[in-house]
A protein has these predicted regions:
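NTP/phosphate- and nucleic-acid-binding module
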Residues: 1-159
Length: 159
């Protein structure tokens, strides 16, 4: 891994036909200095993004779960579920914007690339469970406790 670098470049001044006038009036070819401020951390993050195509494993993902309430009626329940996940150390975001659920799902899957989406409607709020959708697009019904246990184990095992 490289850290930030400083390089001498003899080729670019030649390619651009650069020259300066020296104190004695003669024309001289300059030597160009390049510096790269990106160090090993930035390069490593870039490699990770490229390797995983933005779909980080759950343990590494900045947002591990995105909670998507279907309507305003399920927003309070969505925040309750998110609180339970946060208590377990899961990085979670509630998307309680006034958007259609299809839009929220497409954004969470395609743009945000979160490992898990919890789609919560009135039915889930009444029954006290959650609809979990993973990256394979499979949706299953689970209890909150069951999902918290599963994702906590997945994060701890770094699977």
């Amino acid at each position: 891994w490289q850290c930030g670098t400083v390089q001498l470049d003899f080729q670019m001044p030649l390619n651009f036909d650069l020259e300066y006038t020296d104190h004695d009036g003669s024309k001289k070819r300059p030597i160009m200095l390049h510096r790269v401020c990106y160090g090993s951390i930035e390069r490593f993050i870039g490699i990770l993004i490229e390797h995983f195509a933005g779909k980080f494993p759950t343990w590494l993902s900045p947002v591990q779960v995105k909670v998507l309430p279907v309507s305003e009626k399920s927003r309070d329940y969505a925040h309750q579920v998110a609180s339970k996940l946060e208590e377990a150390g899961v990085r979670v975001v509630v998307d309680d914007r006034d958007e259609k659920i299809g839009y929220k799902i497409r954004e969470a899957r395609g743009v945000d690339r979160v490992p898990y989406m919890l789609i919560l409607g009135e039915k889930e709020a009444e029954e006290g469970n959650i609809s979990v959708r993973d990256r394979s697009n499979e949706t299953v019904q689970k209890s909150i406790e069951e999902f918290v246990a599963e994702i906590s184990k997945e994060i701890a095992d770094r699977a």
